[in-house]
Each structure stands twice: as structure tokens, then as C-alpha cells.
From Swiss-Prot:
It comes from Vibrio parahaemolyticus serotype O3:K6 (strain RIMD 2210633). InterPro entries: ECF_substrate-spec-like (IPR009825), UPF0397 (IPR022914). This is UPF0397 protein VPA1481. It is a multi-pass membrane protein. Signal peptide: none annotated. Its main location: membrane. The chain crosses the membrane at residues 8-28, 41-61, 72-92, 110-130, 146-166. Belongs to the UPF0397 family. One of its GO terms (cellular component) is plasma membrane. It holds the Pfam family ECF-ribofla_trS. It is found in: Cell membrane. Keywords: Cell membrane, Membrane, Transmembrane, Transmembrane helix. Gene3D superfamilies: 1.10.1760.20.
Length: 182
């Protein structure tokens, strides 16, 4: 795998923003060891703008940074889950034929964005929950309650924040595209 300097810088910035935005002081506690955090909007944005590989690495490295600085130790199962969330949301550009880059973002694209966010959260953190029960002998009901709350909460957060950000990105791309065509 050969990453360009631009891609490495984008991953570093995204991971740092995710890592900081994931700290407990910025989150809303909703269940045992479970918080809704603005970092998820950062992950979604970087995934949509730069694709699945960047999304995976921003989620994986960013969650690792959060866990390191939060002081509760690195939970690799949930670090992996965040990477998977970024990977799945990162499929958005190719599934929409890169319409966002062309300045187009319609309600069908928004619906796809929300579905990818939900699938990413369910599958990514579903893997985390499953691995927690096997590797760490965490109670099944606890981790799947965490999964349910996180999947719904993160999807709502990503949908609300993402709508406004992606509308703005589309508008900016459309304006800059019009300037180059003239």
C-alpha cells in the first residue's frame, strides 16, 4: 500500500480531530462506558470526503488516541469497530458516483448516507460487541445494549450534523466547479 503525502496528512488530521472529539469531556454519557461523541461526525465527514481507506484509518487511529488519552486503556475491539464504521461510510463516494464532488447532494444521497451510517455502526460496533463477549467475557446483554444505543445515537448524530456539512460541501463544490468551467 502506497499512500500519498496528502493522504497521510488527511489521516493524521482526521485521527487527531476524532481522538480529541472522542474524549469524555466532549461526549454525552448514555449508558455504562457508553457516550455519544462529536467525533462520529468527524469520522463520517472524513470518510465521505476521502473514501473507505481514510475512513477506516481515521476511525481506528482516532479511537486509539481517544482511549489512550481518556485513561481507561485501549479497547482494541472498539477501536476496530470505529475503523469499520469509517470504512463503510467511506463507500458513499463510489456508491453515489462521486456526485458530491460535482456539487450534487440530493435527498436520495442523504438517505444512502444515513443507511451507510446505520450499517457501519451496527456492523462495526456489532463486531466490537461480539468480540467483547468472546475475548473479555463481557456480559452479552451489556455489550448489545451498548451496541443498540450507540448505533441509534451515532446514526442520528451523524445524520443531523452530516446533512448540514454535506449540503455545504456540495454547495462549495458546485460554486468552485462553476468558476473553473467559465
Amino acid at each position: 500500500m502506497n499512500l500519498s503525502a496528502k493522504t497521510v496528512v488527511v489521516i493524521a488530521i482526521g485521527a487527531a480531530l476524532y481522538g480529541i472529539g472522542g474524549l469524555p469531556m466532549f461526549g454525552i454519557p448514555v449508558f455504562a462506558n457508553t457516550t455519544l461523541k462529536p467525533a462520529m461526525a468527524v469520522l463520517a465527514l472524513f470518510s465521505v470526503l476521502f473514501g473507505p481507506l481514510v475512513g477506516f484509518l481515521v476511525g481506528f487511529i482516532g479511537h486509539w488516541v481517544t482511549d489512550l488519552f481518556a485513561g481507561w486503556g485501549v479497547w482494541l475491539t472498539w477501536v476496530l469497530g470505529s475503523g469499520i464504521v469509517g470504512l463503510i461510510i467511506g463507500l458513499f463516494p463510489s456508491l453515489t458516483r462521486y456526485r458530491l464532488e460535482k456539487g450534487d447532494f440530493n435527498m436520495k444521497d442523504f438517505a444512502l448516507f444515513v443507511v451507510l451510517a446505520l450499517l457501519g455502526n451496527v456492523f462495526g460496533y456489532g463486531c466490537s460487541a461480539f468480540l467483547d463477549t468472546i475475548l473479555y467475557a463481557e456480559p452479552f446483554t451489556k455489550v448489545f445494549t451498548q451496541l443498540s444505543i450507540i448505533a441509534i445515537g451515532n446514526t442520528i448524530l451523524i445524520a443531523i450534523v452530516g446533512f448540514f456539512i454535506l449540503k455545504s460541501v456540495a454547495k462549495r463544490n458546485k460554486q468552485s466547479r462553476n468558476l473553473t468551467e467559465a
